[in-house]
C-alpha cells in the first residue's frame, strides 16, 4: 500500500464502506446521534486509569435508541456473547460450545488489553461487534492482526458491519499495525464481499481446515496492508495506551463511523 496520510486512508476506507453497504445508505442530512456524542472526555479520563481499565474508561457512552458504534469494554461481554452464541451452531466459527459467561468475559478482557474492540448498539442492546486479535504469538508477528466481525440479524443489511470494519482498520493503523487478516470459513459470500470491498486480497485457501457441523470446511485467508513497511518499524502500541495518549484521534474515528452510519 502507498504511504498514505490518515486522511487518504480514511477516504479509502469510507469509500469501501459505502460500497459494501450502498443499499443501506440514504440521502439527506445526518440525523442527530443521541448517545453517540464525541468521547474525548472519556478518553482523556482514561489517561489516569490503570492499564487494564483504560479501554473500559474510554468506552462508555450513554445508551442510544439509534444504531450506534462505540468502543467496547469488559462490561459488554454478556451482550457480545449473546450476538456470538448463535454462530457456534454454524461453520462460521470453529468453536463448538458457547463459552461460559465467565470465560467469555475473560476473553474480552484479554482482547481489550491489547487491541480495539468495537460494538454496534441499538436501544441499549449490542447487535454487533468487531475486534482485532493476535495473528501469531511470536514477537516478529506483532505488526499483524487478525480481524473478526459478527452481526445479529437486527443489524444485518444496515451498514453496521462495514462501519465497524472501517473504524477498526483506522484505529489499528493509528496504533502501528501494518497488515490485517480475515480468516473466513468458505463459502461465506457476505464475508467474502465485505473483504473484497475493503481491498483485501485472497492470499490462499486452506482446504479441509476444520471438521464442524458434520462436514469438512475450507478456510479462506484474506490480507490487506494498511501502513507502509519501514526498515526499522517502531513496535505497535497497545490500544489502551494509545487511546489514553491520543483520545481525540480515537474519538474522531468513532464519530466518523457514526456519522457515515446515519447519512
Model-found features: residue ranges?
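C-terminal "cap" of GNAT-fold acetyltransferases
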Residues: 36, 208-263
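A short beta-loop-alpha structural element at the N-terminal edge
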Residues: 68-80
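Conserved catalytic-core motifs of GNAT/GCN5-like acyltransferases
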Residues: 131-134, 181-184, 196, 201-218, ...
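Conserved GNAT acetyl-CoA-binding A-motif
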Residues: 172-184
